[in-house]
């Protein structure tokens, strides 16, 4: 087995937590954006729409790179079956917990907010199933994708490790140009697959489980594997943690292209295929921007940072129904979009932290929302003297 570095990657922990917590301003700004969501303000805000688009354009690509990095690190630490079990428990248990406790109540609330409760009995069995798939998975989709990726990587990581044993990894060289070409080709390949499905059988693209399990996994798997390779090859990791003006400039241009596609593209034409190509390369370049920024400013340990690193998943899980509640019942009473956005942040973050502190004091909830069994310390077991 390859040795696992003893030094903790504090900046990667921090970046992962910040990317998770960015989901809060992302969804609150979605209320005030020009994008149609479950709940929207009376008038959209141009700047909050731009802010929302910026977060959406790169956040999950970078997140899956970090997930792949830590996943391969644990792959080297545990036997294969235990690695799969630990990884699936860490993401699967919180997902299964959040469905009845968070997204089901959220779905029921939205049925009444949007006036759809009366029409529910009239839906076909498939429409009910598909609606529940979209609404109950909801913002938990990335956890489902991680379960699928972990299962696929039982084979992929084994192949990578076997290939490394038969080759000299010190001779592997990477360049951002080469990676950009590879990810451009991957983006085009994904676009071709999506367009082919759209031509052959379009209804499957509106199927919630197919979207999450197949399409989302297919798009984000290259970033997950890229993270694993960054753990294996120090040169590749250094390529991402070293600031690059070229990547910053390219990412800025790609974001402009993303905005233009959002504004002028058509869903009936090539909008989604174009977006997949843009966000594939944009995500790669933003890995460099985010990693280099985080490596310079976040590579340290502190109690406050550790608190939010540990709390980030729970806060993310509970923020979504809180955001929708705020949008449905409080947003209509605030005339200013920016004031509403700030009030939403205070409302959602404040309640989420309170709920986090409460759940820490209930062992069952602490286990269910983390997937980690409660381990008693040896000192707790020792008899009093």
Curated annotation (Swiss-Prot):
Per UniProt, the enzyme's principal EC class comes to transferase
What are the entry keywords? Acyltransferase, Cell membrane, Membrane, Transferase, Transmembrane, Transmembrane helix
Q: How does it sit in the membrane?
A: Multi-pass membrane protein
**E.C. number(s) listed in UniProt:** 2.1.-.-
Pfam families with a match to the protein in the record: Acyl_transf_3
Location relative to the cell: Cell membrane
Q: Which family does it belong to?
A: Belongs to the acyltransferase 3 family. OpgC subfamily.
Q: This protein is called what?
A: Glucans biosynthesis protein C
Which species is this record about? Answer: Escherichia coli O1:K1 / APEC
Q: Gene symbol? A: mdoC
